[in-house]
């Protein structure tokens, strides 16, 4: 029996993680969970899974949970302190970080210090502080298990292989909601258009990131840190069916790919069961004859400027990826609030990157200060 802490229980990854736990109640037990403000969704989950510890985003949500009736005893925490407490509980074996944004960084570091296995769906943790997180994981001997489908695919393809034999990583991208639109057509797209992803069921922020291809850019940076691969050996290819989740090419030109129907429960479960596998009967079996053909195209950096920003920021390193992430989070929030157009997301990110003076090998305090400064700058443009 593995004891699980789930950070971000009411988000898309959180919900699908709970699906996996529900299917394998003899294998996993939820001992702590966190969520932001969605008490209406969380309270039934608390009653079903009966975690010992719950952390919420603010005092209003705390009161709602406090006033709810549960058949079991549970403690309730608030904010970052609550996130940390949930992650470092003695009983916890695996911390699933399904939080949205850079808020996942500190709880992850604290969990690593307590030698908890990390199942990482929160890519911003590695984007903003990859050198710190990887250094921490190495120091404490803690595995970082990828939950993103692309990184899970690479991780699976590398089982039994030596990293020194890697020629390149090929990360696949659906192209998002607007993969067939020209830049001129993108000038008039709506929020509803952007949230209509063709293949995956995801939260609002990551769906917008998919439409701008920033999500793929963040995944490139994450792959760099997870697998210690230079950016020059990471490629992105458009693959609209989302059947091949990513590939590894070796020096002898052999390519190993991981395939499957788009279902996040597969990589989530693999992270929880690694190095073993369990049946996942609720996911659809891949029948290649039903698909018939698979399509690929080269990623156009002029068409997908956010992808270019990510590669450039990653290569520069230091605090530049922190600026990239913070500016993107604020710009996407502004778009979802109806304050800016879709293409303005790129413009705001570019302005934030252009003004930044990079700090190489930043401390955690440096990263937090740059993150705060960047968010303030982007919002000053918006007002």
From Swiss-Prot:
Keywords, sorted A to Z: Isoprene biosynthesis, Manganese, Metal-binding, NADP, Oxidoreductase
Residues bound to NADPH: 10-13, 36-38, 122, 124, 203
This protein's record includes keyword Protease: no
GO biological process: isopentenyl diphosphate biosynthetic process, methylerythritol 4-phosphate pathway involved in terpenoid biosynthetic process
Pathway info: Isoprenoid biosynthesis; isopentenyl diphosphate biosynthesis via DXP pathway; isopentenyl diphosphate from 1-deoxy-D-xylulose 5-phosphate: step 1/6
Listed cofactors: Mg(2+); Mn(2+)
Gene Ontology MF term list: 1-deoxy-D-xylulose-5-phosphate reductoisomerase activity; manganese ion binding; NADPH binding
Annotated SUPFAM superfamilies: 1-deoxy-D-xylulose-5-phosphate reductoisomerase, C-terminal domain (SSF69055), Glyceraldehyde-3-phosphate dehydrogenase-like, C-terminal domain (SSF55347), NAD(P)-binding Rossmann-fold domains (SSF51735)
One Pfam family hit: DXPR_C
EC numbers for this chain: 1.1.1.267
Reaction catalysed by this enzyme: 2-C-methyl-D-erythritol 4-phosphate + NADP(+) = 1-deoxy-D-xylulose 5-phosphate + NADPH + H(+)
Binding site for 1-deoxy-D-xylulose 5-phosphate: 123, 149-150, 174, 197, 210, 215-216, 219
Residue numbers binding Mn(2+): 148, 150, 219
Annotated coiled-coil segments of the chain: none
UniProt family annotation: Belongs to the DXR family.
Role according to the record: Catalyzes the NADPH-dependent rearrangement and reduction of 1-deoxy-D-xylulose-5-phosphate (DXP) to 2-C-methyl-D-erythritol 4-phosphate (MEP).
PANTHER family from the UniProt entry: 1-DEOXY-D-XYLULOSE 5-PHOSPHATE REDUCTOISOMERASE, 1-DEOXY-D-XYLULOSE 5-PHOSPHATE REDUCTOISOMERASE, CHLOROPLASTIC
Name of the molecule in the record: 1-deoxy-D-xylulose 5-phosphate reductoisomerase
Species in which this protein is naturally found: Bacillus velezensis (strain DSM 23117 / BGSC 10A6 / LMG 26770 / FZB42)
Gene that encodes it: dxr
